[in-house]
Design a protein with these regions (language model features):
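Patatin-like phospholipase
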Residues: 1-37, 45-296
């Protein structure tokens, strides 16, 4: 019986995938293949390449200033180029072709002009991941074979169908958004948390523009920032798509870390996310073992 691991989208919440993998392996459950969408493709690629230990060490050492250092502003095709981040991975991790990784791996992207779902199963691993994480309006699209590719979460946020196509008999899926939608723009949280990296960036921009933009009197409603509106809108859309797709293509098992308190760009909070991924597996480990132990 081949076990497939489908890692869902969710930006910084995706660090929980590391905890999920650690907990599965500790329990003696070793996936035979892995696929991912957006941040799920990043963690999945590190796992498939045998680089998860080094990747986790890098995550745990990340600070807000490191996140800000990867923000290369462009405003052409997106707010950020994403080149600094990809260059970092090329410099610090081996960029093997997808087909040469130690474990079967694939990433999901979306063809920008047709809306088609694209499965990236060969070529540069770094380029495949970069295409899968290209969140519209935030990161610029990636051109591959003449096709502009953006975030796979637009069409398949939790790629159960891809895991099946790769030959999985049983699929363990990880959904990072099940308890998030509708909470970020509540009346009690109208602005970005100053503790998030994007909140820090927005604060600096606001300081630069002080005297140019109208101020909001204390106590009055303050509209959400542009990045918050964008990210919340994408999050709502992906949650609805994920629910619809998994209703027709259900996994054999679902792991759902509780990450409502996590901002999509809290990349510096890896330790908390990893621990939550471990907790989510521990909470349903008995059922998971029973499922995996079924005779093939």
């Amino acid at each position: 019986m081949r076990i497939g691991l489908a890692l869902g989208s969710g930006a910084a919440r995706g660090w929980a995938h590391v905890g999920v993998i650690r907990a599965l392996e500790k329990a003696g459950i070793h996936p035979d293949l892995v696929c991912g969408t957006s941040v799920g493709s990043l963690v999945g690629a590190a796992y498939a390449a045998g680089e998860l230990d080094r990747f986790e060490q890098w995550l745990l050492g990340m600070r807000k200033k490191d996140v800000l250092g990867f923000m290369d502003i462009t405003l052409v095709g997106g707010l950020l180029k994403g080149e600094r981040l990809m260059e970092f991975f090329r410099r610090n991790f081996v960029d093997r072709p997808v087909e040469q990784l130690a474990m079967p791996f694939a990433a999901v992207a979306t063809a920008l002009h047709t809306g088609a779902e694209v499965w990236l199963r060969d070529g540069s691993t770094v380029e495949a991941v970069r295409a899968s994480i290209a969140m519209p309006a935030l990161l610029t699209p990636v051109l591959r074979d003449g096709i502009a590719l953006v975030d796979g979460g637009l069409v398949n946020p939790v790629p159960v169908s891809l895991a099946r196509a790769m030959g999985a008999d049983k699929v363990i899926a990880v959904d990072l958004s099940s308890d998030r939608v509708g909470r970020r723009l509540s009346a009690s949280a109208q602005v970005e948390s100053p503790d998030s990296a994007i909140g820090e960036w927005i604060r600096k921009v606001q300081e630069d523009l002080r005297g140019v933009l109208p101020a909001h009197p204390s106590g009055q409603y303050r509209p959400p920032s542009m990045p918050d509106v964008l990210l919340s809108s994408i999050e709502i859309m992906q949650d609805r798509i994920s629910r619809s797709r998994m209703a027709g293509e259900p996994p054999d098992f679902m792991v759902s870390p509780r990450l409502a308190h996590f901002h999509l760009l809290d990349f510096h909070r890896a330790k908390e996310a990893i621990e939550e991924g471990q907790r989510a597996v521990a909470a349903i480990l008995h059922s998971l073992r029973a499922l995996v132990d079924q005779p093939s």
